[in-house]
Amino acid sequence: MGGKGGRWLAAAVIAVLLLGAVAAVLAANKAGSGQKQVAPTPEQTVQPPEPLPLTGWVILVDPGHGGYDGGARARVSGTWEKHINLAVALEVEKSLAARGASVVMTRREDEDLCETERPASLTKKRQDMENRVAIAVANRADMVLSIHMNEYRDARQSGPQVFYRQGADAGRLLAGCLQETLIAELTPARARQAMAGDYFILQLEVPSALVECGFLSNAAEERLLLTPAYQAKVGAAIAEGAAAYAELRPKGAASP
């Protein structure tokens, strides 16, 4: 009797322990069911950066004159135009590159583009201009920007002036964009309009513009044009005008 009662007691203890374990599991499951389920974090899609406004454009920047050809001469300082053209053109190059363009320069120092030997019928000036055009053609330029300074007998004349080839619709649009940004950024006393001009560099079959950045015959404007900060401002304005054109007329959209 005692042995049998001991076995029953042991069985009862085991049953109680099992029931307790089951109850604990059920309680834990119930508590867990009340917790908010966290969804797995989806993988984030990395968006590619927006292309720069002049990405894919090859732009020829031509600092006018150079070497034997000094261009106009500033009335007060006597500085030759060729030096200021180069300083501004290098700023144009920097600003164009910052906007994604591939820039080709016709010169980076004080030099002309004449050869030592040339046909007798070919003047130094003509050969210089032809070689500038040849650089644009060889590099398949999509746009040409020729940088110059103006000069006039009336010292009161001032302000930037942009020229394009007569009959070149794309060139006229480019010149208009350049003129607008130059006026907006430089706020000249006289707001000029882009004009048609007969310049050799504008005869290319791509959008081309010749930018007269200001008048070296105007003392106040001469002082500005000799200042590196103003040269950088002019360069940035020209690059912004080129970008404005590219937005209106994407590369290859129309002939000049």
PLM regions with names:
Residues 1-256:
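Catalytic-site microenvironment of enzymes
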